[in-house]
Structures are given as C-alpha cells and as structure tokens.
C-alpha cells in the first residue's frame, strides 16, 4: 500500500506522541482531529476513550464497532531514592530483559525529563545471561539526591515511555517504532474512515471507529465503551507476533510472516459467523 504524504505524516506524529496507559489524551486529540472530516460525529468519555461515527442512511441500520487502543506500555515512578536513583513499576507488558541502558521520557509537573535505565558494565557484572528483576531496574536522571529529582518536577506516579521514535528501514520497506502496539491500528481505523468518505462509499451499517484507553492493563476502555455503544457486532484490531525471525518455532506459535497482510484470530470469543464474513 502506498500512503499519501498526509497519511504518513499523521502516522509519524501519533507514533511519536507519548501515550502510556493513563496519559492518552494528547494522542487522542490528534486522532480525533484527523478523523473528524471523514465522520459525522466524534465523542470522548471521561476516561479518554474516543470514537467517531460514520452513519448509514438506512433506517434502523445495525451498528458495527471497530476498535483499536490508544495506550502504550511504559513505566511509572514507584520510588525516589535518597541517592537520586529512581525505581519504577511497569505499565503493561514492558520487557525488563531489554530495558537496561535504554533512554526514557518521563512527564513531570514541569514537562518532559530524559533519564537512562542504569546498567552495570559487562566487565564487573555477574550473571551475564540473567534478565534483571523489575525491582532491580533504576533510572538515572543525573541527580545525586531525592531533592534534585524532585526539583526536575518528578514525583512518585509520574509516567514514562521509551525514547524510540519512528525509523524507516530499507528505503521505507519497514517501519520500526515503539507504540506500534496499537497506534498502528488506530491509524488504520482513521484511514478506513478517510477512504470510505473520499470514495463516496455508503455504509450499510452505522460504523463506530473507537480508539479506546487502558488496554494494556486489562482492556478497560473497550469494555466500558462496548456497554455504552451496545454494537451489534465488533471487530478489534491489534498487533500480533511475526514468527518468521530466527529462533521461533512455527509449529508452536503459528506461521505468521511480516508484510503478508493481517491475521484473523480464532477462538471461543471470536464469533464464527463474523470471522466467516471477514474472510470473504
């Protein structure tokens, strides 16, 4: 698929906009602003879940909800030590095995603060193959005391994400970034609305494009919005694991190839009739 410059700029912007669970509103505003010209109405609930509706002209048309989530994994400050080192709790499934030495963006009362997750030099480190425990990770903000950290505007509970922004590989063939889970699918929803509008396609159903919050800690936003919307059918868009990289057993994890299109989820929670319609 060849994207327009406008679409690519929107994708890059929402990927680069921090949106850890509980702090989704900046990314939600960007998403709502982009999708607004292509839909009939836009709404946001008290927690930040945002949705836009493309209405069918048919009387008593059923409602289809298309859902992605706006939040991303990250960290929150759990403890500020007297020596100035900061200890964190993870939001969602942040992998501590790849955390050491990584830069983080934290968002305090005075704005953004950059820190680095500390890492002992390989020359003096024991258990080289051992992944650290979460409580062993500490963030270094270049401070020597708790007071210095607090002077930066940081406190317990403040949120942070990795610094990694969008990076194109192989002349644009591949895109690498934090928060592709699930900002990419929110982008797909917005682009779907744009394509329907620009091509003049009249939907047979009312379509609710939903970008929900707090998925990384239990699908909370999607559950609340489903009760509110009461759709006749719903399709959730999220990322999955490609298994075509070295060391992965396709017999165990399935045969999923990067760049070969979307995957359809099967299981007790997935209605077989809806899956069959999607496969058509």
Which residues are covered by each model-predicted region?
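N-terminal hydrophobic/helix-forming segments and targeting peptides
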Residues: 1-280
């Amino acid at each position: 698929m060849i994207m327009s410059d406008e679409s690519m700029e929107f994708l890059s912007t929402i990927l680069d906009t921090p949106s850890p669970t509980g702090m989704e509103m900046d990314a939600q505003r960007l998403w709502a602003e982009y999708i607004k010209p292509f839909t009939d109405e836009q709404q946001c609930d008290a927690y930040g879940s945002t949705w836009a509706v493309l209405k069918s002209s048919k009387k008593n048309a059923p409602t289809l909800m298309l859902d992605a989530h706006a939040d991303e994994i990250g960290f929150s400050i759990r403890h500020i030590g007297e020596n100035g080192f900061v200890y964190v709790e993870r939001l969602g499934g942040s992998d501590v095995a790849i955390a050491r030495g990584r830069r983080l963006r934290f968002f305090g009362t005075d704005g953004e603060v950059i820190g680095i997750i500390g890492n002992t030099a390989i020359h003096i480190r024991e258990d080289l193959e051992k992944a650290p425990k979460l409580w062993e990770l500490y963030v270094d903000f270049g401070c020597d005391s708790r007071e210095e950290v607090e002077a930066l505007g940081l406190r317990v509970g403040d949120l942070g994400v990795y610094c990694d922004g969008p990076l194109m590989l192989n002349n644009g063939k591949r895109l690498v970034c934090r928060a592709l889970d699930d900002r990419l699918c929110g982008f797909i929803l917005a682009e779907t609305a744009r394509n329907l509008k620009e091509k003049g396609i009249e939907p047979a159903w009312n379509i609710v494009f939903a970008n929900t919050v707090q998925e990384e800690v239990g699908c909370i936003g999607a559950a609340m919005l489903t009760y509110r919307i009461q759709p006749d059918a719903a399709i959730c868009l999220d990322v999955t694991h490609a298994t075509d990289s070295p060391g992965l057993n396709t017999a165990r994890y399935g045969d999923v190839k990067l760049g070969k299109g979307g995957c359809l989820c099967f299981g007790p929670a997935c209605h077989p009739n809806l899956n069959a319609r999607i496969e058509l």
